[in-house]
Each structure stands twice: as C-alpha cells, then as structure tokens.
C-alpha cells in the first residue's frame, strides 16, 4: 500500500519564493510602513538599519542553535577522523591473535619468580596488639581535666 501523496503542482513554489524575496527586500532596504522600526533618519530610500534587522532575527535562541550545530558537526568530523585513524593503524599491524616472534622471545626471556619456602604472610609479627581478655582492666588513675576558663564557680 502506498502512502497518500499530495498533488504535485509544478510552478507553485517558485512564485511564492519570489514574492517572499521581493517583500523581504522592501522591508530590508526601504522605509515603508511595514519596516519603520528598522528605519533611520535620512532622505534616501535605502535607510533601513540592516544591523537592527539582523539583530532582531538572530536572537539568542538562533545563535545558540547555530553554535550547537557547528559543535555537533565538528564532533561528527572528529569521530570520523578517529575511526579512520584507528582503521589505518589496525591495518598496518598483524591480525588479532597472531603474535610476532620478537614479542614471544621478549616475554620468555624474563627469569621466573624465586621459589617460595614458606608463606610469609603467616609469620608471627612482634608488633601485634595483646590478645583480647574478657576481664576489664582496672581504671587508670588519671587527673581530672582542667577547669573551663569561661565558667568560674564561686
């Protein structure tokens, strides 16, 4: 099933675009009744302020959209460049899973670890705290703390 299509009328879009440019040109350049806010003082028919018109069109949202679009396109280009560089690098090396003999010789040339006679972690260390005893130790004879300097009782 085909989706319903709009009737195609050739030659409709072009006249509308021409009318748009004609009216936009009038408002941009001439001081008519529709573009008084963009006009400056002067006698020439072309006295509209292009900067005011452009500033009105390019609001903060439009500028933010343009900046976001440029940053997005730069990110896409950077991602493509990284992919291309990685593919070029991978094609220069050998295939995955095949090691070069120099790498194998380098790994096998290192000496093995020394033999272990006993487990070093199980050695008794003299710095261990005393074992736990359930009987409480006697109270330590301590002197009372010094009096608080701000509260003197009389």
From Swiss-Prot:
It holds the Pfam family CYYR1. Widely expressed. The chain crosses the membrane at residues 62-82. The keyword Ribosomal protein does not apply. Residues 1-29 form the signal peptide. Residues 30-61 are extracellular. Keywords: Membrane, Signal, Transmembrane, Transmembrane helix. Residues 83-154 are cytoplasmic. It is found in: Membrane. It comes from the Eukaryota. Residues 128-154 have a biased composition (Pro residues). Belongs to the CYYR1 family. This is Cysteine and tyrosine-rich protein 1.
